């Protein structure tokens, strides 16, 4: 098995240049209630989830990502297997596991930081739609996609395992009428976490393209919008308890 390398220990030859290109903000958050896991545990659903969330269509690439996702859920699958072989090999796990959960690693449960960036872009779009940012007059959402990054790939929640399971009741309509559904979601109860925003500096004038005041408003919106699954049900809301400009 390949040895794990902690990304924080990797030193790049351009690290000094990167430090000059971005302002960093460390954001400490406290969830006010539950944050819900949104990763399906049944292997045959993982591929569809990845297709919808990541836009992956190539079967070889999809099989690789499905395998890694299952590994993140603690499911061993054959190396270099096809997508069908991975699903077949994981059928027993699929029968034992239901609903949605969090990815996990040696530091416990986490959400991917791409969710945070997506939330920031959504907040920028809501707050500043119609404006034009930068010398090229980009729409704010597109500008944020190019100017803003989140350090690392994971935001850990301080839990080795989820705190419990929530059953969500729903109603779906079909050719035979409406029917009730029950879907289970693993959750973490009031965890605290932190992430770091990298916001680009305009090389023309040395100023931030997104100002500190704008970041305060964006994060204030994100508090109510939330992170994780079932945000439409007000899950995943939090308070920012620390906001530090690191440069």
Model regions: which residues?
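RNA-interacting cores
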Residues: 1-247
């Amino acid at each position: 098995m390949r040895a794990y390398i902690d990304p924080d220990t990797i030193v790049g030859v351009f690290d000094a240049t990167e430090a000059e290109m971005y302002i960093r903000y460390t954001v400490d958050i406290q969830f006010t209630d539950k944050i819900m896991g949104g990763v399906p545990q049944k292997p045959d659903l993982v591929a569809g989830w990845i297709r919808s969330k990541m836009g992956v269509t190539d079967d070889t690439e999809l099989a690789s990502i499905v395998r890694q996702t299952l590994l993140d859920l603690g499911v061993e699958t054959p190396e270099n297997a096809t997508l069908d072989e991975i699903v077949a090999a994981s059928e027993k796990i699929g029968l034992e596991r239901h609903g949605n959960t969090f990815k996990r690693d040696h530091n416990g449960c986490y959400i991917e930081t791409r969710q945070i960036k997506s939330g920031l872009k959504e907040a920028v779009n809501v707050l500043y739609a119609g404006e034009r940012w930068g010398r090229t007059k980009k729409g704010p959402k597109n500008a944020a996609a190019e100017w803003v990054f989140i350090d690392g790939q994971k935001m850990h929640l301080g839990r080795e395992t989820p705190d419990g399971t929530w059953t969500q009741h729903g109603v779906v309509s079909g050719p035979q009428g409406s029917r009730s559904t029950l879907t289970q979601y693993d959750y973490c109860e009031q965890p605290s976490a932190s992430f770091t925003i990298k916001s680009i500096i305009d090389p023309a004038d040395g100023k931030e393209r997104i100002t500190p005041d704008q970041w305060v408003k964006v994060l204030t919106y994100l508090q109510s919008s939330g992170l994780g699954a079932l945000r439409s049900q007000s899950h995943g809301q939090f308070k920012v308890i620390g906001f530090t400009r690191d440069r």
